[in-house]
């Protein structure tokens, strides 16, 4: 049944809001590229299974990064897939480096950019070296904020730099790839980085940014709540506050609450069913549980992003940012 919000929108606005044209274009491109294979079971079936995979969130698996980040739904689907595929890392209490987490991301998206992984790791590690170990929950919640709100955070980084240098915070921000957090970190590492900026003024700038930003932004009321207990803050302190805010995680809707991060009964049941179908595999996995968690050092090369959808596997995908949690195993 259609929701009241859907009925209140004109058709063209609803189609734009849901990025339907993006998925139609992608479906047609895949249809044309694989028409010989698809002709064996029919075009209607292909479109049915394609849009079923979009609804289930499996359509982003093994796709190019430009498609993975193309829509908010794609980003949520990728976050959920990453969590569901690799939460065993957290259950086993394994600690991995930034490069190892990047290898895991490349298993789902072969051309996933290293820069995004580095930015997410910096939220957790702060001033620590980039080769330090991180818990799965720490990295996951930081990665969620950095990946989903990537364009917004680039603009926030430029605003923070202007405030820190005393420039007019109302200047129109046009962020570029060279002005984001990764390049900005050394420039903000002086005394000003330690002192930060006034939280109330920073929030006013963010509120104005959210009003005019065409990309996804955290709900302003939740951002205000996250900053309510501080008078001054640093840029990475702000990112850490976002990553561990319960309400922002709920509003984004990709990951479960912190206490439920390692629990996914439906996925466990599906994995047990699949493992039971492979002779000899269950015993080997039981004997060496950590083997399934090790990241591949060489990401797979995918010749074509399309996979016959009726044969595709069904896969969907904590952070307090503290040094204590990063340095010890999950329970």
Swiss-Prot record:
A single cellular component GO annotation: microtubule
Protein family: Belongs to the CSTPP1 family.
Chain spans, region Disordered: 288-331
Cytoplasm is among the record's keywords: yes
Acidic residues composition bias: residue spans: 318-331
Quaternary structure note: Interacts with PCM1. Interacts with TTLL1, TPGS1, TPGS2 and LRRC49; the interactions link CSTPP1 to the complex TPGC. Binds to alpha-tubulin.
Protein name from the UniProt record: Centriolar satellite-associated tubulin polyglutamylase complex regulator 1
Region (Required for interaction with TPGS2): 112-331
